[in-house]
Amino acid sequence: MASGHAQNDNIVLEVEDLKKFFPIRKGRLGRSSAVVRAVDGVSFTMKEGEFLGVVGESGSGKTTLGLTVLMAHAPTSGSIVLHLPNESYDLAKLSSAELRPLRKEMQMIFQDPFSSLNPRMTILDIVAEPLVLNG
């Protein structure tokens, strides 16, 4: 199901006011009166060829953000619009069956900092390396 968003400036992904809350179970009946706000009001736009790095402390919601954008977790609210060459889709409004063919267009890469940081390189060298390699 296509959305009414027009593609401009080679935008491939628009995330707007994304929220993902998890209920905290309390009591014998499992009733929930409180929530953990794992992702609360995140917005960003990505253009073709861009990469997004999400950095933060353990438990800050980085993985939850990625999984929610990929629709592995249903968002509590917000929009996730994927722009493909001929159509745009608000992923948060699609069924599992409608999402299935779009999943090949999306990916999340986890990075283990202990295996990716070279102790023989300076921080400047580490940060500059992908920029130099990609022009």
Walk through the language-model features, giving the residues of each.
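ABC transporter nucleotide-binding domains
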Residues: 1-135
